[in-house]
Amino acid sequence: MNHSRSHALFSQAQNLMPGGVNSPVRAFKSVGGEPFFVARADGAYLFDVDGNRYIDYVGSWGPMIAGHNHPAVREAVERAIRDGLSFGAPCEAEVTMAETITRLVPSCEMVRMVNSGTEATLSAIRLARGATGRNRIVKFEGCYHGHGDSFLVKAGSGMLTLGVPTSPGVPAGLSELTATLSFNDFEGATALFDEIGAEVAAVIIEPVVGNANCIPPQAGYLQHLRTLCTRHGALLIFDEVMTGFRVALGGAQAHYGVTPDLTTFGKIIGGGMPVGAYGGGRDLMEQISPAGPIYQAGTLSGNPVAMAAGLAMLQLVQEPGFHARLSETTSLLCEGLEDAARAAGVAVTTNQVGGMFGLFFTDQIVENYAQATACDVTTFNRFFHAMLQQGVYLAPSAYEAGFVSSAHDEAVIEATLAAAREAFADVMR
């Protein structure tokens, strides 16, 4: 493939932006080489500035669940912008969005719109601290909840990709208020609550880890956390920025039958535009200003164009059978990848929940951060580039989940698996 235009743009970008990108994982530092620059996207495909086409399993890191540039979403945006881009005042679309979320998500009786997943998680933590009068939070190794200071302790996503345990610039005192557990560790969670349970404001968790690749919870684990939080008076927060409306219509909480106190959203509810939200029970949410004393605000929150895009996307995922078909397609992909690896003699396992999947270069089932980081990253990197050269774009890190959309039909999956058979053979040469 020719990448001359992408190379020129990346060289220019490195003089203008830190690392040449606006989010670290995009720089390809984990996998090596240089990123391609996207010109446009459609359905299951990305097209770069050099004219190359890629089957896309990143999907803008999750929100493109109906494929890129879906006509219904695009048309909703086109209609909305005729009325203006931003009002800084209430609009009908944000009321409709709130009604939709509260109708579909078990934990949400009220919801507040924000502008990103990071903003949603920061706001949820502030609410939890204000509502409980406590300061400590509990998170999990490899889980990423945005770049707020409290979360950059043994975080996933770009932090894990770069091998940084805790970011410089995070005050030690703030880090000391964040306790970290191993995901899927029942005994560790119990022991921690026995020790500091009375000080914990909230437990925040990705119910399916999507930022240390894709790691589902063991049976009963989320319920165990729910029980501990209830017993000790702490709030349980599900970060459903990735899982919300993707693994099931009601998110991971509906899929696993465990209801948190607060839920954070992003990605899909903006249809690809910058949006976030957090929601929970009425008694908690009415403590947020102006209804209550816990302050949170945002000029662009509830932006009418973003609301229009998100509502169109949520309408699509409510179609009968949408999530069942998405899960079937993802299973077909994962089974095919494992078969192709096995035939080539490459140790690979996969995890899948709905339309999310993880590809691990190991012969062991991966259930936590430590196991994810023990996988063969060198072989993954070679596989990544072999796939990219054949026009298949996986996340440029061994520690990021993959995403399938409804635009990934059987022909797209078969083309992916044909490329994988070649790529697995390449890494064994």
UniProtKB/Swiss-Prot annotation:
Pfam families: Aminotran_3. InterPro entries: 4pyrrol_synth_GluAld_NH2Trfase (IPR004639), Aminotrans_3 (IPR005814), Aminotrans_3_PPA_site (IPR049704), PyrdxlP-dep_Trfase (IPR015424), PyrdxlP-dep_Trfase_major (IPR015421), PyrdxlP-dep_Trfase_small (IPR015422). The modification N6-(pyridoxal phosphate)lysine is found at K267. It is found in: Cytoplasm. Homodimer. One of its GO terms (molecular function) is glutamate-1-semialdehyde 2,1-aminomutase activity. GO terms for biological process: protoporphyrinogen IX biosynthetic process. This is Glutamate-1-semialdehyde 2,1-aminomutase. PANTHER family: GLUTAMATE-1-SEMIALDEHYDE 2,1-AMINOMUTASE, GLUTAMATE-1-SEMIALDEHYDE 2,1-AMINOMUTASE 1, CHLOROPLASTIC-RELATED. Keywords: Cytoplasm, Isomerase, Porphyrin biosynthesis, Pyridoxal phosphate. It is an enzyme of class 5 (isomerase). The keyword Cytoplasm applies. It catalyses: (S)-4-amino-5-oxopentanoate = 5-aminolevulinate. Its main location: cytoplasm. Its cofactor is pyridoxal 5'-phosphate. GO terms for cellular component: cytoplasm. The gene is hemL. It comes from the Bacteria. Pathway: Porphyrin-containing compound metabolism; protoporphyrin-IX biosynthesis; 5-aminolevulinate from L-glutamyl-tRNA(Glu): step 2/2. Belongs to the class-III pyridoxal-phosphate-dependent aminotransferase family. HemL subfamily. It comes from Xanthomonas campestris pv. campestris (strain ATCC 33913 / DSM 3586 / NCPPB 528 / LMG 568 / P 25). Its EC number is 5.4.3.8.
